[in-house]
Amino acid sequence: MNIKITKLALVVAASFSANAIANIEYPLMPGDPLVDQQWHLKNTGQAAFSDRGGKAGEDMNVSLTHAMGIMGAGVTAAVIDGGVEVKHPDLIDNARPGSWNFTNNSPDLAPGSPTDRHGTAVAGIIASSAFNGIGGRGVAPRAGLVGFNYLVSGNQTTANWLQSHGMYSDGFAKQSFDFPRVFNQSYGRTLSSPRSFDYEESPWLKTYEDAQEEITRTTHGGRGAIFVKSAGNGYERQTFTDSELGRGYLWFENRNHGLPLQNVNLERMDTSFWNLVASAYNADGELSSYSTVGSSVFVSAPGGQYGTSSPAIITTDVSGCEAGYNPLWLRNDLHGGHPLDPNCDYSARSNGTSAAAPNVAGAIAVIMSANPALSWLDVRNILATTSRRIDAEHPGVALSFKDSEGKQVSYQAIDKWQTNAAGYQYHNFYGFGAVDVDAAVNLARFYDKNLGEFVKTDRVLVTAEAEIPDGHLSGAQSTFNNDQELTVDAVQIRVNIDHTSTRDLAIELISPSGTRSVVMTPRTGTILGNNGMQNTQMLSHHFYGEQAKGEWTLRVIDTASEDEAYIFDPRTSGEPNVNMVHRNNTENGVLKSWDIRFFGRK
């Protein structure tokens, strides 16, 4: 049966254009009992053990690729997470040497407790085995897996970070065939104030960036590797773990005007060019309600919702009905010993951008296996070119507010889908769109594009000293004339702003071609951002393919002229929510200076 499907798929793939292939429906090959419910691989409207199904077709589109036998073979993915049950019956065949347990300094990566479940779920999304008669399957079911329990409490040292991200104790990236080409990082932080991206103040930032750059550009004979990073889960409810307020949740009135409490550019490592950041969409083909968004999002992938009223992601779980996600109180019809999973080895409740990132990592492994000669830069170009415009009619988000003159005004804080001057479509929710594995592999197999020489420019400092009017659309503006000729991959800025309410600020970067990128949305959860921004870094992919030469414009707009009420939930049983007020700034802010650098090609 499988041989016949594969032969047919090869004939079809050889005979049709990419557009023709995209318009043909292919079945997902059978062989795993849960695969029919894995909507993220093939969405037919199935409920995935929740109350209802989603919208058919909103998925990773892997059917033809899997039918052709392109499933990640020869590519190893690293799971940087908590423990991973590598001896799980659906993971063991893809386990490769190289995993490390930092807690006991051994290669035994078994979860240290029944609740250490996150890493096993992530690993299964990437590369749980196919056609073995159990469970479901991964996006890249023949890729290799290694893991590092860096996220376990007590393991988060710089040395451990470097090892888990591919840099060994001798200071060099390991050069070997089984060295990972894909690193999955399903982790991040939620911040209550903007942070500085300053190498002198935080030397570890340079250590991390230098390591990721070296591994990305030099490993595997120069073909390199790719780091995938989850965008975060802070759109509608901000979770604080390091706040002066203590541990808890934050909500603003009126659902924060429909705007995200956490912008992806507030997390410093999400502003690194070397991290390919993924947001999450649900089974209806819309942004997952929790997904953090922003201009450094590269692509989007399935993360689902919560697996109760609507689907989450089905993947491997720590084995046993008393471990992993199975014992959680949130109801899901798979959990607790379903006939298709009597030993409780799987979960239908994995979600978050923690699930979206490994979907992207698995897709990258498949793309690399389709054409092992592809470089890291080629793979990024393939994703930017072939990702699907999801939620195509989304209007963006307009913020209506009363300005300092008492007039009701509107600011377009998140644009609808935009096409830049190079023809690439981009949305701050979805980046270049939803990853389409079949389309990406179709391009990858015969890829012959010469992208040119990769270039990273030096930062250029621009002095501004421009006043930011309180609660007024006029904002502050500063320009920089760039004389370097290169094709843009991404643009990175750092800003220095004096302001006592950074939550109010929208920051825009406008290219010489007129493309506008909102690199910081207003009304973020930076309620403790009373000291402005010092070297706060932001990244934008919105200008991909455009020419860098010409005048770049930075605008900063203050979008509030009044105080705002919010609620703080201390997350402690029995303690009541606290009603609080965020005070508006009493003086105009100042855009002091900013710097800019380009990542691109000549």
Task: Please provide the spans of the model-predicted regions.
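Secreted peptidase-domain scaffold signal
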Residues: G232, F401, E405-E508, R571-K602
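Gram-negative bacterial Sec-dependent N-terminal signal peptides
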Residues: M1-A22
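Extracellular S/T/G-rich loop segment that most often corresponds to the catalytic His/Ser-adjacent loop
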Residues: D81, N254-A365, S369
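An often Trp-containing, charged/polar helix-loop segment at the C-terminal end
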Residues: N371-Y426, E562-A565
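Substrate-binding/access-modulating region of protease and related hydrolase catalytic domains
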Residues: M71-A73, S129-G133, F148-S272, L340-P358
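N-terminal domain-start motif of subtilase-like serine proteases
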Residues: L34-A78, N104-T115, M167, E209-R217, ...
